[in-house]
Each structure stands twice: as C-alpha cells, then as structure tokens.
C-alpha cells in the first residue's frame, strides 16, 4: 500500500517567495537597464519556489521505495527503503526550517520536510522491518 506525506510549508519558504516577489515588483517598477530582465528571473524563481513548496510529496510505494517528488518542475528521486542507513530529525535554526536528514547508499544524503515528522520516521522504520521480514 502506498503512503504519501506532504511537504511542510515553513515560514522560511513563504518569506523567500515573498522576498522574490517584492524584488521582482521593484525591478519591474524601476525599468532601467537590465532590471526588467532581473525582475523576470526573480519571477521565474518565485514560481518555481511556489511549485516546490506546494507540490512536493514523499511517497512510500508498495514495492519498498521512497519517492521524493520535489514539485511538478523538479526531478523525482527514488530511494530504496532498505538502503536508508539513518533518518533523523534536525531542529531548524534561524534560516533553516526543521527537516529530516536521510542518509542512504554509500554516503549519500538528502533531506525531507514532511508535515508529520515522527510518523515519517516511523514509516521508514516500519518499511525496513517489513523488508527484513520478507528476506527471512
């Protein structure tokens, strides 16, 4: 059975998108030199940020994979659950939101920001136990 976790919308993510929108608006209002082009770039970055903030999902599939889909514009990442070495919650600081650091494979690291942090880590452990029971 598939289980999907949605991305946690953080204050830092919202602040970044608002800042990009304000800079884009300022660049469009000034209209001197290359500022309209800079405003357009900020607008595109803001749109990509909104997509990533709202459409990121973390899906545990029935065949033992964790699929991290970082929005409609971003690339998806597939990690086999039995390759996950560690998953630990990291408290956010001033500029970073709370997130989960996932260590997998041979020294590879990625992050996740699901809404239910403890349930996400429990789901990883449950799927790993389920995979080990299948092997035995």
What do these predicted regions represent?
Residues 4-6, 57-61, 67, 76-78:
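Ser/Thr- (and often Asn-) enriched beta-sheet segments in non-cytosolic proteins
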Residues 1-31:
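N-terminal membrane-targeting/pre-transmembrane regions
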Residues 91, 128-131:
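A general structural signal marking secondary-structure boundaries and capping sites
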Residues 23, 40-52:
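Single-pass alpha-helical transmembrane signal-anchor segments
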């Amino acid at each position: 059975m598939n289980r999907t976790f949605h991305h946690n919308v953080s204050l830092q993510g919202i602040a970044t998108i608002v800042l990009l929108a304000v800079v884009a608006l300022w660049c469009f209002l000034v209209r001197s030199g290359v500022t309209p082009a800079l405003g357009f770039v900020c607008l595109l970055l803001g749109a990509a940020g909104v997509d990533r903030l709202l459409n990121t999902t973390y899906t545990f599939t029935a065949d033992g994979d964790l699929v991290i889909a970082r929005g409609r514009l971003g690339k998806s990442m597939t990690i086999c659950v039995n390759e996950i070495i560690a998953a630990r919650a990291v408290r956010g600081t001033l500029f970073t939101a709370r997130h989960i650091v996932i260590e997998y494979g041979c020294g590879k690291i990625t992050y996740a920001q699901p809404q239910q942090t403890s349930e996400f880590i429990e789901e990883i452990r449950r799927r790993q136990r389920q995979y080990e029971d299948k092997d035995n």
